[in-house]
Amino acid sequence: MSKVAVIGAGIIGVCTAHFLRKNGHQVTLYDQNEPGTQTSFGNAGLFASHECVTANSPHLWKNLPNMLFNKNGPLVIDWFYVFTHLPWAIRFLRNCTSARAEHIAKSLSAFSCQAGLAYEEIFDDVDVLNNIVHKEPIFLYESKKLFEQNQYAFNLRKKYDVQFVVINKEEIAKIEPSLEPIYYNGVVLKGESFTNSPLEITQKIFNNFIKNDGHFIKIKIKSIVQKDNSLFLKYEEKEQQFDKIVVAAGVWSNMLARTIGDNFPLDTERGYHIVFENNNNLLTHPVGWAKTGFYMTPMKDGIRVAGTVEIAGLKKPMNKNMLSMIEKTARKILPQLGKVKSEWMGFRPTLPDSLPVIGESKKCKNVYYAFGHQHLGLSLAAITGKVIQSLIEKKNTNINIDALNPYRF
């Protein structure tokens, strides 16, 4: 079997390392941070394994003016940043047609159809019983108008067998009585579940990997080097040789890809969360709020309100206005929320078509990419790891990943 390096110890990299190690490969995982403590740490905790609708919608054009100038909406844009990154923005908008939205939904559906099964394989080896909650998410709409504006997304989900049920105000109140009844109706995403600690999920998979002879080196990788058909990782003043290398470094992946001649239109959607004290067990299900694009999820450490999108790159500091909007809106929906325990911002890796990059480099044989999962990193981590394992072993994946290939741009 091969000597493999996996760069990136978020949920994608850890799941990939798990499958490769389990199949007999000698695997070393690299990250400059502790496993699971970066982007994977801060998500809303949903296993949205059947989600196929992304931000690339033909209806975005109609709503764009309002979205762009609404500082209390689900999308906030730093105009200076966007103007300096116009090629990415133009590519994104080109993917906001009916034909492209259909293609993206079909591609995600084909890839995610075995996401749950891939996680089951991991969870057969890793005890996460206390971290998985089988309560279906509820997504709430403030008004009939807002609900009707989302019919296109509902129809697309129906086409690709995403199961959901529309429930009325009275039904919502029975399920989650602590919610202020300021909603019009809601949608229950059937068959989905969530984790009460994304960090613990990643750490438990990582600990199992280490327990079974996996290796972890906490260090920043500077570059990938190819010499005489051999592959090396360069860090500090050292080089380490490997047979195969997997780049699963999230939004930082392109920095490594460039060192071997690849270049991807990878950018970031900055996401935020606030954790509130949950003294009275206010929620039993994840509850989404369509108007602001966040979920309120009951977790071990409190109620985490996570989501929103800010287009502002990697360098700008945390936007306190985003946090203020999240807190104000969350308290309006759930008035009994306790004190703020913590605030967080992370960087979702995003490509213009909202699809991940999964496949082998053409510039450098035996280098594989697994990044760009934007809002679905937790949901698609296990199936991504499974597919990368199959690609490395030259096995049939039984999943059509043509739309995810690294050279589609």
PLM region descriptions:
Residues 3-28:
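N-terminal Rossmann-like FAD-binding beta1-loop-alpha1 element of flavoenzymes
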Residues 22-41:
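Glycine-rich FAD pyrophosphate-binding loop
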Residues 45-47, 51, 55-95, 223-226, ...:
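Active-site substrate-recognition segment that forms the wall
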Residues 86-204:
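Rossmann-like flavin
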Residues 140-144, 158, 170-175, 268-269, ...:
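Flavin (FAD/FMN) cofactor-binding core of flavoprotein oxidoreductases
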Residues 167-171, 175, 217-231:
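A conserved short coil-to-beta-strand element within the FAD-binding core of flavoproteins
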